[in-house]
């Protein structure tokens, strides 16, 4: 990733960094109308996810997670910024004239990619898991055949194919979870780009607010009506044996997954909290 440091004309540019290879494009038939965000509220207007709100208006980019242009080569034209995800996207021009957006694989610029059953194991190519050798690094993994990739789509995400037996393949996901998936499901070879997004300095708090992120306030400094840790005189303790969420549930490691989900039999090892 080519990081460009601006001239130190102000504190925000002095501490910020920009990827000079990423472009911005708002005139494209693959870009639809305004993408509405809930700002952390449910349909009744009650806060269900804190520290969200504001932010710039966004246009939605139609991403091709299915990769169903079989045996048709496409060339990566541009790497573009997508405000709806932390991974970059790239515009693909296929040989039949089709144009699509896909997640940008790491370290690919101006290369050709293809989807098929007997294509080379090359960064950016998509193929079924049954045609991949063990140990292949993959992303954009299907769970249901033909539905499109649903796993390992964030910036820097990468999974590993560790076993194949019968009709299933065993994958180690970025969270550390080990689970079974049908060998007929497809995935893309390589790692998602924009790996250093967590280490990137935004330069100023305004850049964070543009992304719809609000300040994080500790519950212990709130009022009792706002948080179970709130209230008291001065720097008072939380007043409970264990920390709690804003809704009174146990915090710090409580399992939130339902105990009777259909996919429990497919998960060989749970992710670590």
UniProtKB/Swiss-Prot annotation:
Question: What InterPro entries has UniProt attached to this entry?
Answer: NA-bd_OB-fold, Rib_uL2_dom2, Ribosomal_uL2, Ribosomal_uL2_bac/org-type, Ribosomal_uL2_C, Ribosomal_uL2_CS, Ribosomal_uL2_dom3, Ribosomal_uL2_RNA-bd_dom
Q: Which UniProt keywords apply?
A: Chloroplast, Plastid, Ribonucleoprotein, Ribosomal protein
Gene Ontology annotations of biological process type? mitochondrial translation
Q: Cross-referenced Gene3D superfamilies, in alphabetical order?
A: 2.30.30.30, Nucleic acid-binding proteins (2.40.50.140), Ribosomal protein L2, domain 3 (4.10.950.10)
**Where in the cell is the protein located?**
Plastid, Chloroplast
Q: Name one GO cellular component term.
A: mitochondrial large ribosomal subunit
Molecular function GO terms recorded: rRNA binding; structural constituent of ribosome; transferase activity
Q: Which SUPFAM superfamilies match?
A: Nucleic acid-binding proteins, Translation proteins SH3-like domain
Region described as Disordered = 1-53, 222-273
Ranges of biased composition (kind: Polar residues): 1-31
Question: Pfam families from the xrefs?
Answer: Ribosomal_L2 (PF00181), Ribosomal_L2_C (PF03947)
Question: Out of the domains of life, which is the source?
Answer: Eukaryota
**Record-linked NCBIfam families:** rplB_bact (TIGR01171)
Q: How does it assemble?
A: Part of the 50S ribosomal subunit.
Q: Which family does it belong to?
A: Belongs to the universal ribosomal protein uL2 family.
The name this protein carries in UniProt is Large ribosomal subunit protein uL2c
Q: In the record, what lineage is assigned to the organism producing the protein?
A: Eukaryota, Viridiplantae, Streptophyta, Embryophyta, Tracheophyta
């Amino acid at each position: 990733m080519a990081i460009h440091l601006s001239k130190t004309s102000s504190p925000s540019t002095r501490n910020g960094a920009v990827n000079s290879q990423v472009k911005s494009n708002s005139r494209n038939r693959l870009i639809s109308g305004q993408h509405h965000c809930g700002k952390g509220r449910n349909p009744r207007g009650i806060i269900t996810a804190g520290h969200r709100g504001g932010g710039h208006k966004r246009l939605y980019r139609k991403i091709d997670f299915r990769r169903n242009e079989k045996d048709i080569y496409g060339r990566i034209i541009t790497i573009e910024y997508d405000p709806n995800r932390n991974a970059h996207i790239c515009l693909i021009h296929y040989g039949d004239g089709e144009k699509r957006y896909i997640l940008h694989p790491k370290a690919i610029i101006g290369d050709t990619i293809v989807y098929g059953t007997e294509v080379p194991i090359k960064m950016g190519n998509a193929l079924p898991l049954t045609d991949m050798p063990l140990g292949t690094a993959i992303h954009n993994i299907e769970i249901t055949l033909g539905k499109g990739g649903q796993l390992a789509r964030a910036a820097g995400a990468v999974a590993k194919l560790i076993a194949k037996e019968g009709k299933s393949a065993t994958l180690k996901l970025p969270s550390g979870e080990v689970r079974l998936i049908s060998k007929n499901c497809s995935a893309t070879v390589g790692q998602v780009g924009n790996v250093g997004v967590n280490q990137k300095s935004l330069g100023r708090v305004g850049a964070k607010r543009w992304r719809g992120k609000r300040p994080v306030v500790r519950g212990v400094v709130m009022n009792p009506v706002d948080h179970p840790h709130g209230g008291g005189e001065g720097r008072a303790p939380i007043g409970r044996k264990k920390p709690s969420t804003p809704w009174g549930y146990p915090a710090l490691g409580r399992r939130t997954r339902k105990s009777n989900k259909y996919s429990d039999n497919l998960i060989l090892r749970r992710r670590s909290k």
